[in-house]
UniProtKB/Swiss-Prot annotation:
Gene3D superfamilies: 2.40.50.150, 3.90.1070.20, DNA-directed RNA polymerase, subunit 2, domain 6, RNA polymerase alpha subunit dimerisation domain. It comes from Halobacterium salinarum (strain ATCC 29341 / DSM 671 / R1). It catalyses: RNA(n) + a ribonucleoside 5'-triphosphate = RNA(n+1) + diphosphate. Keywords: Cytoplasm, DNA-binding, DNA-directed RNA polymerase, Metal-binding, Nucleotidyltransferase, Transcription, Transferase, Zinc. This is DNA-directed RNA polymerase subunit Rpo2C. The gene is rpo2C.
Length: 608
């Protein structure tokens, strides 16, 4: 160790020494790495503020390959590029030769990367292998992303992961809890090189829609989409939803165990014969049976939890088994797809029932293009009411023009043009970032095919048959159906379960919960002066409770049912006891304060 002015050197986070010239040390390590004297896994960087040299060679770092640049020129020659293409040399050979480097996040702070060879200067240290590699897998699948605003690329990449397709070819035998399957997935008309590299075209997750950009009777304002009912009836964006239910014959201490069977009348909590009509004798439902809300899928009984109360005769009563059948979730229906029997780890019998439900696009279902242009179906228009072109083409979807300008998703417009050109030519259009097919080329294809280069067409109103004054932009674009479907989200409640502790309605759709009236909702009711509505929502429909309070001391009174009297245990009074209406949550607060040794007292006044 030397003077304080020397820079500290860290290797994998441990201080190993100091050096008087950190920049020179870092450069020496880099040169040694390129010569093969230091492992290609090593990365080095110099901290700007402190001058510390950080050397990393540990596992778990995300690194990416870049071409080395010296004096404004890539070190890799065109001959070597051709040799890699032809298979004469491997990519790894270029790495070993120090002509391609893998850079981690920390070293990336110290380098200047050029995106294209034309922009290289003497200051540049590295060059991207291909401009599209600045994107990941998700963003790389978006066509023409360089024409979009960055938040839209992020949204497009995110929603691509939520799209429905064919998740696995063995979906019939996979026991996934939830699974979606799109009918007739299509290969996108406009593709990128990333799409081809990952084999997305072999198993796509979307369909090509014919889209007209125009308003439609106000049904597509605020990102709503108008869909052609005829297309939907011809199975556009139709999908199936699979949910797997599971039951197990558990074993308990003492040799008792669960049993798959039809619960008899002697079973505690049995639902009656009607509930079990579609079960076989073994307690399992048959495939292709229609099931709906709270249908029993697996008839099951369990041993009792506790010994019964003693009978008058002195002995214990015979133990009754409990009903613990597996039922459908509330609000869901469908058809039993498969019933699978298997064995658990401890040798217990395991049953899995898969239920499928056909999902036809309906009002409220979410769709999105690859450019972050998401929307929900606002209207299903009959085909005869949809606008049509001179050739008689009726669009599958009508998109509001206001969705485009402020969001600057020009890539969406270009994909529509490219999709139209590809459809007419019967070919796939390359929309790879930075290097894809140009706009002029696409426009030329449209003109060659007898269409306007702008993509606009004369359209006629389906309702009146009159020609629409403005020309309408029509094209083909790849749309995803997302798994956010209204049938999974629709929820309402009038009465239902309450929480044990607070006696307020449960929370959430899965628990058949109530809809919370929060502070802001409360304020709007106050603003209307609707006092009785306020009381009804916040008290009567929630956790109203009547308790007896002593008017003398303000303590909670006691009701003795056997003696049929209500009295205050504090004052021993019976005359001055009043029945008070309050929230059970408040009563719980009073009880918890009493448990802490605090005696809350209520001051009673006559209601006006």
């Amino acid at each position: 160790m030397s003077t304080e002015r020397e820079a500290k050197v860290y290797v994998n986070g441990s201080l190993v020494g100091t050096h008087e010239n950190p920049e020179e040390l870092a450069e020496q390590i880099r040169e040694a790495r390129r010569r093969g004297e230091v492992s290609e896994m090593v990365n080095v960087s110099v901290r700007d503020r402190t001058g510390e040299v950080i050397v990393n060679a540990d596992a778990g770092r995300a690194r990416r390959p870049l071409l080395v640049v010296e004096n404004g020129e890539p070190v890799v020659t065109q001959e070597e590029v051709e040799a890699v293409k032809n298979g004469d040399i491997d990519f790894e050979d270029l790495v070993e030769a120090g002509k391609v480097e893998f850079i981690d996040a920390e070293e990336e702070e110290d380098i200047l990367v050029g995106v294209e060879e034309e922009e290289l200067t003497t200051d540049h240290t590295h060059l991207e292998i291909d401009p599209q590699l600045i994107f990941g897998i998700g963003a790389g699948m978006i066509p023409y992303p360089e024409h979009n605003a960055s938040p839209r690329i992020t949204m497009g990449a995110g929603m691509m992961k939520q799209s429905l397709g064919l998740p696995a070819a063995n979906y019939r035998i996979r026991p996934d809890t939830r699974q979606h399957l799109l009918h007739y997935p299509q290969k996108a008309m406009v593709n990128t090189q990333t799409t081809e590299q990952i084999g997305y075209d072999d198993r796509p997750a979307g369909q090509n829609f014919v889209v007209a950009v125009m308003s439609y009777e106000g049904f597509n304002i605020e990102d709503a989409l108008v869909m052609n009912k005829g297309s939907v009836e011809r199975a556009l964006s139709r999908s199936h939803f699979f949910r797997t239910y599971e039951g197990e014959e558990r074993r308990y201490p003492g040799g008792q165990e669960d049993r798959f069977e039809i619960p008899g009348d002697d079973v505690r909590g049995a639902r009656g014969e009607d509930a079990y009509t579609h079960l076989d004798d073994d307690g399992l439902v048959n495939p292709e049976t229609k099931v709906d809300d709270s249908s029993v899928l697996l008839g099951k009984t369990s041993p009792p939890r506790f010994l019964e109360e003693p009978e008058d005769m002195g002995g214990l009563s015979p133990q009754k088994r409990r009903e613990t059948s597996v039922t459908m979730r509330s609000g869901e229906d469908g058809v039993v797809d498969t019933v699978t029997l298997m064995e658990g780890e401890d040798g217990s019998k395991l049953a899995k029932v898969s239920v499928r439900d056909e999902r036809i696009p309906e009002l409220g279902d979410k769709f999105a293009s690859r450019h972050g242009q998401k929307g929900v179906v606002g209207h299903l228009a009959p085909q005869e009411d949809m606008p049509f072109t001179q050739e008689g083409v009726v669009p599958d979807l009508v998109l509001n023009p206001h969705a485009l300008p402020s969001r600057m998703t020009v890539g969406h417009v270009l994909e529509m043009l490219g999709g139209k050109a590809g459809s007419l030519d019967g070919r796939s259009v390359d929309g790879t970032p930075f290097t894809g097919e140009g706009e002029d080329e696409i426009r030329g294809t449209l003109e060659d095919r007898g269409f306007k280069s702008s993509g606009k067409e004369v359209m006629y109103s389906g309702v009146s048959g009159e020609k629409i004054e403005a020309e309408i932009f029509v094209g083909t674009i790849f749309y995803h159906k997302l798994y956010h479907m209204v049938s999974n989200k629709l929820h309402a409640r009038s009465k239902g379960p309450v929480q044990v502790l607070t006696r307020q309605p449960t929370e959430g759709r899965a628990r058949e919960g109530g809809l919370r009236v929060g502070e802001m909702e409360r304020d709007t009711v106050i603003g209307h002066g609707a006092a009785m509505v306020l009381k009804e929502r916040l008290l009567d429909s929630s956790d109203r409770e009547e308790i007896h309070v002593c008017g003398n001391c303000g303590m909670t009174a006691v009701e003795n049912y056997e003696q049929r009297r209500v009295y205050c245990p504090n004052c021993e009074e019976e005359t001055d006891v009043h029945s008070i209406e309050m929230s059970y949550a408040f009563k719980l607060l009073l009880d918890e304060m009493k448990a802490l040794g605090i005696a809350p007292r209520l001051e009673l006044e006559e209601a006006v």
